Structures are given as C-alpha cells and as structure tokens.
Amino acid sequence: MWFNVSEYQNQVTKEIEHKLSNVNKLYLEVVGNCIDQSDFSRIIPGFPADMWKRIFANFKYDLEVFFCVRAEDILDEDKEWEWWREFKDFLTIYLKKIENQYGTKPHIVINGIDVENMYDLVFWFETYFQKQGYRVWEKYKNRAYETSMSRLLSEDWFGNDDHIPTSKKLILVCGLTPESGKLTTAAAQIYQDKEIWIESNYAKLDPIPDYNEDKNSARNIAAQALDLCALHQYGLDDIIENRNVLEKSEEKLKFLRKFYEFLRVKAPDKIEDFTVWKIEFDSENYVNVLKVLQEEIERTDSPIIQKKFIELKDKI
C-alpha cells in the first residue's frame, strides 16, 4: 500500500495544532534526521524525504529549533584532531541547512556537561559557534532515568541548567543521534517554565514509534534498525553493543510518568499518547524492513553492527 502523504501531513498538522492550543509552549522531539527523512522512506514506500519541511511550513512564523549535541562527542579523547575539524565543519553546514529549511537560526544545546572533565573543550566549542552567531546553552550531566525525581526537579539539577528563552509556541527539539539528550532538554525546559508560570508540554514526532506489545513486530524491528543506523553513521558503535531500544523506550515512559506526576500533571498512560500520529504497518513494511536489514548487513564492515542487524533479521 502506497503511503498517503496528504493524509499524514494533515493529521500531523491538526494534532500539533491541537496540542499547541492547550499550552503556552510545546516542546516537540523530532526523531531522526530533521533535514532529510530518506531513512523512513526506505521502510515506508512513498514517505517523502522532505516530510518535516512540508509539515512545519504551516508553523514557520511560530517555530524555534533546539539542536542537541552530546558533550561526550565533544570530549571524546579517542578522536583525532582531523575528525574534530570535520565534525565542526559538518555541524556548521548542518546548522545552516536547518536555518534555511525552518527559517530560524537554531539554538545549540550541549547536553551532559561535566564541568570537572575537560570543560575547556566544551568552552572552545561554545565560543566557536557563538562567533558564528549561534546561541549556545549548557545542560549538565545527570543520570535522569536513575535519579530520584525530587532531586532531579530541583535547583541543583534541572534548575541548574540554562533556561533557554523562547518567543515562539512550537519548539522543535532535534539532534544528530538518538543519544543527544532531546528528552531531558525538553523536560528541563518544562520544569523551568513551570517555575515562572509558563505552561508547557512535551510531544514526540516519530513515524515508527517503538511501543508495540509484540517486541518482534515489523514496527519495533524497524525502529531498532533505524536507531542502529543513526548510531553507526555517527561513529557511536560503543553504544550499539549493549543497546536495547525497547528498554530505552520503557525507561523514557517511566521517566515521563514520574516527571508528570511530580509536576502534578496527569500523564498519558501509554508512550503512544505522547507520539504525534503513528503510521499503520502492513505486510509490505515487513518486506521493506527485511530489505533494509540485508542492505545494512552487506554494507557495513563493523562486526558489532553486523551482529546486531543479523539478530534483528532473525526475529522476523
């Protein structure tokens, strides 16, 4: 079955508008590449590579972008200087593409900063992009999913992060990788907004959310495959070996429930209730998932990623 572009675009637009009508600000986590959605196109026939551009054209006058970067990527001692130069140049081009596509200069949010660990490199990174005209913000290291909520939602934790001032209602929270800290960025903002009487909320834009009860469904396997592709693309094979996307999803749901309960706001019962309009899967999607897995197995020279993709393929 060919993907109905106009229906999906209309439904997502309506749901975002509905969520915006109930709050002062909506922090919308955007899954995957915020510039090019061709990875989704590989699994969903007819899904446009510029789907997000089409949708957010409807919100261009009331939209800001947070672009999240892992502090660990800046501080990785195993990276050579040549890699750093390429990373800096790549980010410069990528941020410019975001600005051109969404009509706004993104905020850069550095997540997981440890001020006792090579902070001079983080400061160098900040200074470089500030000189390019970007606003750069700091979010500090915490173990968000293991920390008690009363401690996390305090002046010593989320309250100690930079509170990013925004003038628009819709804030897209993007990042290069699944580990860039998008959820905790949104949560810290919501906590700090509440402290100054701004009502804000969280939602997630993900065409293939990983929350089915059947752990071996095509949807869940597709979500895991795309997650592995993104991590491998940016050289994060060290994360891949012990990666379990479904456990991560469950961790996030537990965190969100506790987070909303602590703020005395009713939390949705299921992770899909945070997600903006999921796409239904059919038999054709199984075929496409198998095809993508086989392509990645043949393409990669990483034993870790090959093993992971073979494990996923064997589940179908």
Task: Outline where the language-model segments fall.
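Flexible phosphate-sensing "switch/lid" loops adjacent to ATP/NTP-binding sites
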Residues: 1-174, 179, 189-316
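Hydrophobic positions on the alpha1 helix immediately C-terminal to the Walker A/P-loop
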Residues: 184-185
